[in-house]
């Protein structure tokens, strides 16, 4: 066995938890392009955004100057239920791979929601309650975000309406029941309950849905129901801000032991986990203090960074949300029903998209059978059953560690283990039975999505 000079798990003291979120946009030389009003094509004002989002969250969304924003005491108190989360040295995985690489992962699955999503859910619910709202609406893919928000709303006694992507609603019935346990109403999307849902069902009969569809329904419900606002689990900059606690804790823990990661790897859907994990490290790179390699890993079935276009596009299928300049496959792109429901989004966070355009991070896509091979390999040696989404980062981390085995390099790798996969056993079953397929969209498939992108100069 290797000499364990560094603990298997590094836990911070409660007193070491971040008291502020880090806003990476403050350090970006090239700021992300502004959100546009879909009717006027002019930058969205705070007043316009306030019709959809909570007021304080609008202020955070538009804030590109303050590097640090204080975390309210009520949110920090809630964080203490499950944070600080552990930074784990993957000694057993290293030994299994026989690699000179040093592998670390930040484990965010140690709460009932099973993922990192609670970090932003509690913040958004807090600001909704503070504003005096009756409730909130949202979308969810695999269900972690919906679960996290239902927990947060229950804590603050808010009503919670969740539109769950239909394929995940059917694949993960128990995830649905957890949400209902916390008082949320859960509707499969697209549905007959909204005008946009009915339109999508008419245009795409038999569709299994997408995050873009679910967002449209949630926004419609929020904007047509008195006392409600829409909240979301990824994509927008306010969510990346809240998720910066992941990277901040990681950096504090690594600094305590004099560890500097060479590369930082995160799965990428809308960008919340990836952006939160890399934020403080990326800030250091932007300020010229240190250099790191950042790798975004996305599903080959929904390759927004690796095969998408960097343009203004709608954030939702129904085209009611603001336009964002991002890497996108087109808001009309309906990804195949793969088993990483939380990554089935057509676009990418605007700040991360700008960073990718500027060459600050690398992106790669992986097929789901290879992802589940990595998930199983990890589970057998590290004792955690990883979520399919998280397993995209595991795949890349293993690949990089094996490269180190070939070259003899002793690179230090940090990846984000966003959550657990206990509600994903249908996916694991299909993998074990040899029934899992790898779908990669053709150029013709992508062209259909690109055709719906608005022409904005």
Regions from the PLM with identified roles:
Residues 268-276, 368-434:
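Claisen-condensing/thiolase-fold acyl-transfer catalytic domains that form or cleave C-C bonds
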Residues 68-70, 194, 200-238, 246, ...:
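Active-site/ligand-binding loops adjacent to catalytic centers
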Residues 107-118, 136-145, 236-239, 265-270, ...:
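Active-site nucleophile and cofactor-binding loops and adjacent substrate-binding regions
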Residues 137, 145-208, 304-314, 425-433:
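Active-site-proximal loop->helix
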Residues 123-133, 147-159, 180-181, 278-288, ...:
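Alpha-helix C-terminal capping segments
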Residues 3-133:
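Positively charged, low-complexity intrinsically disordered leader regions
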Residues 86, 105, 117, 124, ...:
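Buried hydrophobic positions in well-ordered alpha/beta secondary-structure cores of metabolic enzymes
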Residues 120, 128-167, 260-274, 294-295, ...:
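A short, small-residue-rich loop immediately preceding and capping a beta-strand
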């Amino acid at each position: 066995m290797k000499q364990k000079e560094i603990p298997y798990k590094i836990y911070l003291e409660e007193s070491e938890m971040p008291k502020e979120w880090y806003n990476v946009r403050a350090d970006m030389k090239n700021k992300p392009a502004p959100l546009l009003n879909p009717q006027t094509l002019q930058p969205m004002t705070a007043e316009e955004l306030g019709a959809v989002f909570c007021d304080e969250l609008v202020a955070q969304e538009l804030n590109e100057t303050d590097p640090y924003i204080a975390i309210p005491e009520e949110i920090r108190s809630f964080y203490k239920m499950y944070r600080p989360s552990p930074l784990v040295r993957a000694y057993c995985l290293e030994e299994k791979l026989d690699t000179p690489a040093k592998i670390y992962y930040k484990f965010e699955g140690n709460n009932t929601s099973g993922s990192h999503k609670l970090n932003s859910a509690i913040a958004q619910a807090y600001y909704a309650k503070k504003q005096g709202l009756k409730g909130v609406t949202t979308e969810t893919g695999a269900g972690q975000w919906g679960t996290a928000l239902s927990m947060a709303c229950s804590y603050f006694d808010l009503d919670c309406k969740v539109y769950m992507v239909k394929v995940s609603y059917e694949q993960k019935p128990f995830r649905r029941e957890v949400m209902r346990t916390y008082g949320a109403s859960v509707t499969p999307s697209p549905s007959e309950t909204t005008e946009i849902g009915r339109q999508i069902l008419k245009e795409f009969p038999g569709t299994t849905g997408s995050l873009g569809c679910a967002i449209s329904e949630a926004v419609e419900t929020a904007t047509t129901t008195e006392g409600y606002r829409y909240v979301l689990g990824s994509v927008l900059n306010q969510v990346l801000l809240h998720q910066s606690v992941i990277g901040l804790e990681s950096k504090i823990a690594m600094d305590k032991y004099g560890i500097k990661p060479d590369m930082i790897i995160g799965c990428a859907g809308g960008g919340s986990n990836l952006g939160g994990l890399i934020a403080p490290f990326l800030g250091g790179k932007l300020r010229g203090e240190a250099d790191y390699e950042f790798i975004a890993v996305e599903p080959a079935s929904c390759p927004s960074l690796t095969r998408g276009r960097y343009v203004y596009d709608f954030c939702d299928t129904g085209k009611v949300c603001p336009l964002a300049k991002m890497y996108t496959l087109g808001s009309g792109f309906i990804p195949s029903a793969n088993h990483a429901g939380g990554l089935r989004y057509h676009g990418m966070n605007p700040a991360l998209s700008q960073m990718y355009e500027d060459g600050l991070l690398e992106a790669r896509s992986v097929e789901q059978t290879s992802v589940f091979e990595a998930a199983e390999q990890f589970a057998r040696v590290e004792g955690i059953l990883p979520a399919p989404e998280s397993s995209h980062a595991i795949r890349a981390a293993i690949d990089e560690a094996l490269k180190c085995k070939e070259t003899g390099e002793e690179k230090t790798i940090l990846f984000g283990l966003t959550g657990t996969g206990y509600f994903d056993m249908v996916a694991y079953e299909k993998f074990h039975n040899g029934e899992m397929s790898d779908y990669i969209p053709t150029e013709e498939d992508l062209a259909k999505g690109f055709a719906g992108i608005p022409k904005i100069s």
